[in-house]
Each structure stands twice: as structure tokens, then as C-alpha cells.
Amino acid sequence: MRTDKINYYLDIAETVLERGTCLRRNYGAIIVKNDAIISTGYVGAPRGRQNCIDMGVCVRETLKVPRGERYELCRSVHAEQNAIINAAREDMIGAAMFLVGKDAKTGAYVENACACSLCKRMIINAGIIRLIIRNNKTHYTEINVADWVSNDESVSGVMGY
């Protein structure tokens, strides 16, 4: 049976996450416009810096920082950010981003995954209009990015995931 397009792109994002170097959670992101892949990104330290997986230590894990908090302590650049950084803005306007996250230890899909507040702002400014996030192998959530603009979480004080 032929895979539908959304799961096809989510499968590719899931393959991209296998390059991730985080000891906690790995994400893969791809940006697609007009059925062409514009860019990919995965979690990893900035170019030239040592990755957590190579160092064998995660500062946020050592400090027991909960998910969605204190990202300034993290060495990594998020998958969404790397996908945006590696693309030209004019190619991203009107595009969709596909995102898959897995626990680095168990390989289980990240429950209730969503872009963090910084990634949301970058996605908005990149001109991406849809975010599709895999919940499990067959189910996904589709987010209209315009909803993030009209429901500004920074005004309500709700941040993080």
C-alpha cells in the first residue's frame, strides 16, 4: 500500500532525527513546499562544537531541568532552528514543516511534542504556515501557524512546550 504524503514526509523527518546528538530527546525536521524538500534539520551542537553524545554529558539532565525549561543551558540547536537556518526565507514562505521527536534512551515518540517558544517565533518569521508533528507511527497533529500569531503565548506568560 502506498504511504500518504503526510506520513511520507514524517517518515523522512524521522530518518533525519537519527542524526541527532542529544542525550535526552532527538528531533528531525523537514521543510516542504510544493512537494519539494527545501531543508532538513536535526538536534545538535553548533557547527564545530562538541556534541553532548560525544561528551557523554547533558547539562540540563545533570541539573534535572524539566522539559520545556532553561534552554539557554542546552548546547544544542533545535531541529526546527537548523532546518530554518539551512534554508532561504523566500523558499520557506507558504511552506510546511514536518517534525518528529523521540526519546534518546527509549526510542519512544515524544508525547505532546510541539515547538518551543523560540522555535515558534522562528517558524512564524520564516513564513512557514503549517507544522505537522508525529504523535506515533500513524497519527499526527497539524498546527496552523497563524494560530500562534493570534494566540500570542508571550502575552499570557505561557512559554516552553
Regions of interest found by a model, annotated:
Residues 26-41, 132:
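Short beta-strand scaffold segments in enzyme catalytic cores
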Residues 1-2, 15, 32-33, 66-69:
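General secondary-structure propensity
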Residues 3-10, 39-161:
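Zn2+-dependent cytidine deaminase-like catalytic core
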Residues 1-27:
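Short, basic/aromatic recognition patches
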Residues 15, 33-36, 85-88:
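Short glycine/serine- and small hydrophobic-enriched flexible loop segments
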